Amino acid sequence: PPFDRRRTVWRQGLRDLELQGLSMREKGRGTFVAEPKLREGLFQELTGFYEDMAGKGRPPVSQVLTQEIIPATAKIAGYLRLRPGAEVVHIDRLRFVDGEPLVLVATYLPAARCPGLEGVDFTERSLYEYLATAYGLIIARGRRTLEAVPASEYEAKLLAVRKGAPLILLDSVSFLADGAPIEYYHALHRGDRSRFEVELIRVKGNEIGRLGD
């Protein structure tokens, strides 16, 4: 019957929209128009979230949840090459783009390299830019890992998603030109609103080692 044909075409159209990321389906609720995902460069250039979004004409605003000096745990000390218990600046921020919460990030830096950082307002300021202008600390390279994780109840509430919703966990260590680690951060991006771009290059075998230096 004509109705069945129309229904088949309609369903196929919805599937096509889902594949293109233009719609999303939730069990028990139906199909909705999806918000376009924010594109972020992951490996081709080392920029912070603020610089990345500001460069697209959408500068983020941060709600600073925690900003303090704490003793480094063994894990944080390992990333920053400090002794456990050494003082680090800890900053937790919920980052908004166009009024929507998109990223929950915890950042750790050696307190000795950036005195007074715990008192700086980062609501609408780039951390990387401030490190460069206030302390002469210019980040030269970084190492990032990416994985999918479910949102905890706390994370879901802050990011306005359901508990268990997929988040993209980005772990990063940033280094100065002399190889000293200056920042470790742990960022949770909303899976429904984030899209990362990766640029790959082909190199000769004897050049691979230099990329990991």
Regions found by a protein language model. Give the residues of each.
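N-terminal helix-turn-helix
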Residues: 1-33
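All-alpha effector-binding/dimerization core of bacterial HTH-type transcriptional repressors
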Residues: 35-213
